[in-house]
Structures are given as C-alpha cells and as structure tokens.
Amino acid sequence: MGAPLSTTRRGMGQNLSVPNPLGFFPDHQLDPLFRANSSSPDWDFNKNKDNWPMANKVGVGGYGPGFTPPHGGLLGWSPQAQGVLTTLPADPPPASTNRRSGRKPTPVSPPLRDTHPQAMQWNSTQFHQALLDPRVRALYFPAGGSSSETQNPAPTIASLTSSIFLKTGGPATNMDNITSGLLGPLLVLQAVCFLLTKILTIPQSLDSWWTSLNFLGGTPGCPGQNSQSPTSNHLPTSCPPTCPGYRWMCLRRFIIFLFILLLCLIFLLVLVDYQGMLPVCPPLPGSTTTSTGPCKTCTTLAQGTSMFPSCCCSKPSDGNCTCIPIPSSWALGKYLWEWASARFSWLSLLVQFVQWCVGLSPTVWLLVIWMIWYWGPNLCSILSPFIPLLPIFCYLWVSI
C-alpha cells in the first residue's frame, strides 16, 4: 500500500491554513488535494490576509437564537457574533426644548478684535476718527469692548441729525418734539388765513358804511342802472363790471385801501418812536441861523452801544455849542408837540384838560361809561371793520 501523501496530520481544529467561513470543516482541515499540509504558511497566521469586512459583523441573534458558528463565520468576529452580550450605556434623556423652558438669552457677541482681527489692523485715519463717536464705537466694540481706552456707553437718545435718517433697531424719536414743532406753524398758518379773510372784508364793510352815510334811510339799489347796460338789482357796494357804478365803487375801495395803509404807517411810526428808534432833536432854545460855522449834530451815543445819538448840539450867536439830550422815548412826539404848541397856544390848554380828566371823580367816569354803553352798538358797527387789525397791531407792539 502506498504511503499517505502527508505524514503529519493535525488534529481537529489544528490546521488553520484554510478559512472556514461556514463551519463545514470541524477539524479546520482540508484533504491533501488542497495541499493543506504543504510548506505554505497557515492562513490564520498570514500577515497579509484580508480580514472579514465590518459589514459581516452582525449583531447577536442575526441567525436565530443560540446559533453561533465557530470562529465567528459569516456573523463576524465581534463579541456579539461570538455570543457574548455586552451592556451598552443608555443614551442621556433629551434636553428640554425651548418651548418648555422658555427662550434662552442671546449670548453676548464677542468683540471685533476677536472675531475680525484683520479689521483691527486697518490703520486708516478716517476709521479711527469715526471710532471717536460713541455710537460707532458701540457697533465695533460691543459688550464693553474697547480698542485702546475706556469707552463710554452708547447713547440711548437719537440726536437731531440721526433722527432724520433712522436705522433699523435705532432709538425711537421723541414724538412730543415733532408734534410741538408741527403744531406751532399750523396754528400760525390758521391765524394768518383767518386774519387775511377778515382783512379782505374790510374794504367791503367800509364801503357799505361810507355808502350808508349818504342814505340815512338805508342803502338803496344801485342808481347806475340804465337801459343800455341792463343789470339785475344789486347794492352799490357790489356793482358788476358792466354797471356804470362799478368805477365809483373801485374808487371808493382804492381810497379805503389808502386810508388803511396810512393807518398802518401811523401805527408803525408811533411804535418806532416809542422804542426810541427816531433820534429827533427837540427844538433847541437859543439857536440862531446867523451862526458863522456849523455845530456837530451829535457828541455821544446812547449808553455807548446804541447806534442812535443821545444828544444834539445847537450853536448860538456867540459861537459856543450847547448839547441837549434826545429823549429815549417819544422823541418825535415831543418834538411835534412842542412845535405845535409854539404855533398854537391853545394846545397848551389840552394839557390842563388831561390833568383835569385824571382828577375826575368816579361819578363822572360812571357817567362816561353809561354813555359809551348807550352809544356802543353804533360805535361797534362803525369800528367793527378795524377789529381784525387789532391783533396785528398788538403783535407788532409786543414784538418790536
């Protein structure tokens, strides 16, 4: 009988040269046909072998309970594939959501020098000048950050310039200032429009009053109607352009406008004279027209700062100049009064009359008040057209 192909035959499970994935070879050994006993190294001890991939490492019970092939097989080489159970740590419970615990505060933004260090390397002069503004500094260095020195907190009130162009998230503007700033001009505009409409009715009212003086029984119809220019019945104060009385109405209105303008000029002149803005020299006593040389008009200024003179000079016949101070108020009025008193001696009696009126008893004043009350309606009808001018005069008197 021939000798066997291999003299040495290893026991069961001793030959590890051939992989046994399915566990069909209990002794882990093949027939000599596969040259298992050759001089080639064992498979299990070959360093260049390819281990089983991780995909074959299935968990415990992948092929049913209690079935674990030897050496892992297709189930892999993990402890679970060998039938060894390990206890895995349980996952921590999920954190509570924001809906249950509430919104967490937003973390403070880090300074610019930490998040954008390249911006700190910019040596532009304009950039550093802009950082001098606390509002700009608060944008680049939040949460108390600073570039090199102590920073002031950003202001919470918008300035007048920044309130015009507001940014999103900027401080709210003060609506009280805006409301008060708009309410004043609106009230002034309303008052001006009201006075303008009233002033425009002054010529018509005065025209009616002027016409009524010619007709004591009442204002009749316009007498300017004729057959050549037939017009409807109307008052003489509202003649149409086709009426012959239209030119007379325009003439009366023009005279009324001149009268109102003269009244305003007189009021302005009185106001300026009251403020001392008319440096009119009073009548100089002892002045003569035969002087050999002129005298200075003014020597000093009022209080050293006023642009109006405070005294006037006169030169008598002997050639010496005499200075007379100008009144600080009512200079023109006093000049006119002294000039009129020098030519009309009876005007001096008015001074005594005024002084006498001041010393009247209360009974006389009550009598005067009763007369005004009795004749008041007629006086009001005459003076009513001038009532709209009263607020204007009062405003000018107070402002100037």
From Swiss-Prot:
Residues 120-174 are annotated as: Pre-S2. HAMAP family: HBV_HBSAG (MF_04075). Residues 84-114 are annotated as: Disordered. One of its GO terms (cellular component) is virion membrane. This is Large envelope protein. The chain crosses the membrane at residues 182-202, 254-274, 349-369, 376-398. Residues 2-253, 203-253, 370-375 are intravirion. Belongs to the orthohepadnavirus major surface antigen family. The keyword Disulfide bond does not apply.
